[in-house]
Amino acid sequence: GEVLMGHLRYGTFGGNDLDSVHPFVRENNWITRNLIVAGNFNMVNNEFLFQQLLELGQHPKQFTDTVTVMEKIGHFLDDEVQRLFDERKEYHDNKTLTHLIASDLDIQRILTRASKDFEGGFAMCGMFGHGDAFVLRDPNGIRPLYFYQDDEVVVAASERPAIMTTFNVPFEKVNELKPGH
């Protein structure tokens, strides 16, 4: 299927220029290590998260919560890809490994590890290079996040009326994503 991501950004932290427009893209030659992130969030511990990245040996290109969040997820994505590669490299060629890694990535594990230290409100979506997509909401439910699903589409948005209007569905068919999911 297709994955479409849209985001209306209003700047609360970082710049209000074209370089701050979502989605943010993290590119890599390995398809499974590519990452796109967009969302409504404000990390209150961005300095701490940024410092964690520096301690991992990374050098993020910007000091914004969006880049910090993306690189934090990217670190654990890379870690998971490497783990799967190391487990299987003796048994498969690299082309086969690429497909196996894409099908066996543990997205929940990646996001749980990456978001462990996130503090603040967030509702975000993202996609990995091989096509798997995700949504993520802060554990305290500070930022809203809703979803609708039928036989043809799965959609998530931070505003219920956006889903209701676009897909012509009644209020009761649009569900709130539980905090921490």
What function would you assign to each model-found segment?
Residues 1-179:
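Conserved short alpha-helical segments that host acidic/polar catalytic motifs at enzyme active sites
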